[in-house]
Amino acid sequence: MMSSKSSHRLAGRLVVGCLASLAAVVALAAAQWSMQPKESKLTFVGEQAGAQFEGGFDKFTADIAFDPKDLAASRFDVKIDTASVNTQDGERDDAIKSADLFDVKRFPTARYVADRFTDKGSNKYSATGKLTLRNVTKDVPIDFTFENKGGEAWLKGTAKIKRLDFGVGQGDWKDTSQVGNDVQVRFALRLKGTS
């Protein structure tokens, strides 16, 4: 049978353990940010027939946990509705959504998850994350700035991807003389602290 002193010691350890776990959860919650969809943008620049064109996505979500003082606990998780692509050209949008490019019926969601961050100084950061597009996952680095003013912040940055690395371009669309392989991605996320 456990003695009274042993019982008290065990209870004390359990309480300390619970408090430590609670403190860890609170610390993580302090770095959580809520994206404001109406003020946030996710855009890209591509090239078709030698001319640049711009586009974006009307629907995407971003779960952001970011603290410049605790990069190890930071994480980005962005989910993109591929069918919401919008280049202000209906014919081009239909082509991008087709089976040879995004194939939105089979792959309705693209996802980017980053959990490795580097402080480059002067409010500039880089991250290495994994982009999944058309069921292909590859590392994609991003460069960004983070400006926090009283619990409201802007997260702005860029990335560069090669569309053919993700199978975006089947058949004639593999021809990079017609549609460039390099795509510049830009994002500007308006964030509000959730705690």
Q: PLM features: residue spans?
A:
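Bacterial N-terminal signal peptides that target proteins for export
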Residues: 3-18
